[in-house]
């Protein structure tokens, strides 16, 4: 999908606001069956190289995969048919993929989030680190305590980025301090008041970026009044 205005547009992106919701469900399945193994073999995550694990770290990876597939597929096969096991594995992984994708897409791939361009060296963003987090990250449904519990406070993505070592149970209180501080210094604090508002913004952003001529400005609304 085309998630950033910096990405080239392809013809199939015209319908990404429809088909990406289905592909989100494949995310976890791809990790389980392909992505992790590919990364280990090629020594890259995306286009970035990393030091491949060896010794004990490699053993942990292999053992972890064996344990996972034993619990996810092997054990159920002792009691159910192959078709039933594959069906429910696919459904479970698809639900996990959609939920995982939505949580992080609503934090970064919405109308209000900025997509800064690196400097001339292509490696460094000119904006200070904390400001960069605030401009590229959007909270959602901060007052929804049930949702906050269900996703472990990840609806407070701004606070998650700024204070990764603080327990998520403190994010509601921290967010009020961050919002007040942003207002004091004239820095935008980006949020959607509800979960539905975040979903809608993500949908509109996908649709806009898929159009032949994407003219959408990076920020379409006042983040302090967005609902």
Please name every model-derived segment:
Residues 163:
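Solvent-exposed interhelical
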């Amino acid at each position: 999908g085309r998630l950033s205005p910096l990405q080239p547009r392809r013809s199939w992106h015209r319908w990404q606001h429809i088909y990406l919701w289905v592909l989100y469900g494949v995310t976890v399945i791809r990790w389980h069956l392909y992505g992790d193994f590919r990364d280990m073999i090629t020594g890259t995550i995306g286009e970035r190289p990393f030091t491949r694990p060896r010794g004990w770290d490699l053993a942990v990876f292999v053992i972890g995969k064996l344990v996972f597939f034993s619990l996810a597929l092997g054990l159920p096969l002792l009691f159910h048919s192959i078709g039933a096991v594959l069906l429910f594995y696919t459904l479970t992984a698809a639900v996990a993929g959609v939920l995982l994708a939505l949580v992080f897409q609503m934090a970064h791939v919405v109308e209000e989030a900025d997509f800064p361009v690196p400097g001339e060296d292509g490696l460094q963003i000119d904006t200070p680190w904390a400001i960069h987090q605030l401009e590229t990250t959007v909270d959602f449904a901060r007052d929804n305590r049930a949702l906050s519990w269900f996703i472990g406070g990840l609806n407070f993505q701004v606070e998650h980025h700024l204070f990764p070592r603080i327990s998520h149970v403190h994010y509601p209180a921290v967010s009020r301090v961050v919002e007040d501080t942003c207002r004091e210094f004239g820095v935008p604090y980006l949020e959607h008041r509800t979960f539905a508002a975040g979903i809608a913004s993500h949908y509109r952003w996908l649709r806009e970026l898929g159009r032949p001529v994407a003219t959408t400005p990076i920020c379409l609304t006042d983040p302090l009044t967005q609902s």
